[in-house]
Structures are given as structure tokens and as C-alpha cells.
Amino acid sequence: MRYSLLKILTEGLTGNRGWPPVWREPEPKTDYDVVIVGAGGHGLATAYYLAKEFGITNVAVLEKGWLGSGNIGRNTTIIRSNYLLPGNEPFYEFSMKLWEGLEQDFNYNAMVSQRGVLNLGHSDAQRDAFARRGNAMRLAGSDAVLLDTEAVREMCPFLDFDNARFPIKGGLWQPRGGTVRHDAVAWGYARGADSRGVDIIQNCEVTGFQIENGICRGVETTRGKIRAKKVAVCVAGSSGRVMEKAGMRLPIESHVLQAFVSEGLKPVIPGVITFGAGHFYVSQSDKGGLVFGGDLDGYNSYAQRGNLPVVEDVCEGGMAIMPMIGRARLLRMWGGIMDMSMDGSPFIDKTDIGGLYFNGGWCYGGFKATPASGYCYAHLLARDEPHPTAAAYRLDRFRRGAMIDEKGQGAQPNLH
């Protein structure tokens, strides 16, 4: 079924009795061309583009829990392409272009809202770094505007310009950045993949890999063995545990990242704002709640919940730039498991085991990368060669000395 205004009006007048299920609940077959482990944003996007762009429809997406129960529904919904390094910026700009046409592409309202992303600067050195980053973005075909203090004040008069501990010296603005309804992204990709014949199998945990003579021939699951010509893993923070079942160790650590939403407030924040002297980022949802987050909890964890010191630290960051939120009450908070790589950049690559592919290490950048990650992973699976924009995301880059350290923090995952 194709969604349209006419269909909505028709169903509204007839009691909404004609809507079919958005996707099927199929039983797993015994063999597929491709088995994708993980029905999050990246896994579903990969299945969608395999079917749509490359004509491979004999695909299964296996999910331990329910569709979209991982990080795709736990992030702060921000999309942007304001990266510096040549290994990153073209990829994220490709993702931004896919975001811009996403809703028309899969005929689903993902609520893409390009209201801009503003990174605040608080020193002369930071302003110079923003100028460098903005120039790199524009060279890669993206958009960037360097703002002075008065331009930031005109855009966001509610910020603390007069008494802030870290004075606002300006900012870097990406007008095309913004937010997207994260659950709708999962549902839209699932609907699009399912309509093209992909089997999305929920409550089906992968318990092992069928490896014969160094080649992966399929997976073992709680619902039986499934053979496959290719097995593609994209399970975010569970990457280490899943790939360990294939005898692999990854240059990745798992950390918990918390996110928060306040009670509903009147519209005040025009887009996304980030604090440059700490780690705090905030946007406002359609319901009026402030959606914000900050740093990792700092210790290894597989729990989808965090601890109170980070709550205090994040709220202090918010108060530092806009004290007006001090009387707003927190509505809820949650956590997601981040797959933090050693240089802060991801992997989309073949493994040393034939027929086994890996997508992970996304750190903070997983949600905004969803369309490009799915497209590039599908390209790799279909053609057995990397997509040009993801060619740098190789598993062997540490051995080759080809790190992509966007923040320059070194090999400490919880700092990226």
C-alpha cells in the first residue's frame, strides 16, 4: 500500500479499517542469500538498499528482541554532516543527502526537520578550529556558516551572553542539519524492506556462526539453523559479544550513553545547539520536550541505563549556556550501548572469515549515519567491494596506521 493524503482521508471516513500490517511476521527459511544480524537502523537500512538498489531480496534480518529496540530508538535524533577529516566528511555528507530524500524514497513520514545545528565556540582557538572545519565541510560539498557573537545572539537570544563562565565567541552553523523521528526511521526502512520481500524475523537471537574451513556458511539461532551465502553483522554495542561467537576480537569497547527529555515547554530552541566548553547538546521535540545528552558514563557496560554523576554533569552543561531551563523538570532518561572504536570512527568491512561482514564502531555517530551506512554496507555485500565514501572504514586500518581520529584523542575509546 502506498500512503497518501487521499488514503488518510479515505480511512478516516471509513473507520480506519483498511490499514494492513506495516510488515509481515514470517517464519525463518532454512537458507538465504544474505542474513543480516540486527534489526536496528543500520540493519534495516542495509536490507532495504540491498532489495531496492541491488535487487537482492532473498534476505533475512534477525533481531534478538523486537524491531528497533536498540540504539535506533534511544538516541537524541540529531542529523548532521559537520565533520573535518576526509575519511569522514564525504560519508556523512552522503548520508545527509539521503536523509533529505528519505521520506519520498520509502513513502513514510520520518519527520525530517532541517532546522540547523549550531556548535557554540567559547575561545579564539575554538573559533579558528571552527573556521577550519567549516572550510573542510564546504570543500566536501556540505554547508557551513561561521557566526560571530552578535549573529548567535540574534539566532538564540535566550543563551547566557552576559554572565557565562565560558563566554560565547561565536559558532559554526550547519543550516541543513536537524532532527528526525528515530522510531519512524526504523519503521519506514522495515516497511520498505518487507514490501520488497525481505524477511524481518523478530525474537530470533543468534547464538553462533556456522564456520566451515574458514568460511561462514550461516548462523545458529534460537529458532534453528539458517544457512546463508553471506552473513552481515551490525549490532552496535553488542558487536564484541556477537563477533566473539565467531572467534573474533574487535578494536571496540562498549559504553553506556545516557539521554534525557524534559517536560513539554513552549517552543524556544530553533534547531540543535551544542555547548563547546563541555559536552552538552540539545534540541526541542514536537511535543515541546527538551531532548539532550552529554558524555558517556566512562566505564564499560552493556546496561541500557546509566548512573547519576553523568546526570548532574549533563544538567550542569545545560545550565552553563541557558540558565532559563533550571526550573524545567526531567520527564525521563534512558541509556544506549555505544560501540566505541579506538579512533572514534566506524568500520564497514569484510572480515578475515569468508562470507562474514562487519558494520560497527559508530560511537556517537550511528544515528546520523543510518542511510549511508545501510547503502554502503549493501554495496559491500552486493559487489564485495567498498563504496567509495566508506573506503576508509576498514578493520585493518590500525595495523596500517590509517587511523581516522576526528577528535585527536588517541586510542582511548571513552574519550571519542
Predicted features by range, described:
Residues 1-34, 52-56:
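Extreme N-terminal leader/targeting segments of oxidoreductases
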Residues 39-42, 64:
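Glycine-rich Rossmann-fold phosphate-binding loop(s) that bind the pyrophosphate
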Residues 51-72:
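Glycine-rich FAD pyrophosphate-binding loop
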Residues 319-416:
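C-terminal catalytic lobe of FAD-dependent flavoproteins
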Residues 48-52, 77-79, 108-116, 215, ...:
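Active-site substrate-recognition segment that forms the wall
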Residues 172-230:
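Helical element adjacent to the flavin cofactor pocket in flavoenzyme catalytic cores
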Residues 90-93, 120-129, 172-191, 201, ...:
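Short beta-strand to alpha-helix junction loop
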Residues 76-158, 309, 317-319:
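Dinucleotide-binding Rossmann-like beta1-alpha1 core, especially the glycine-rich loop
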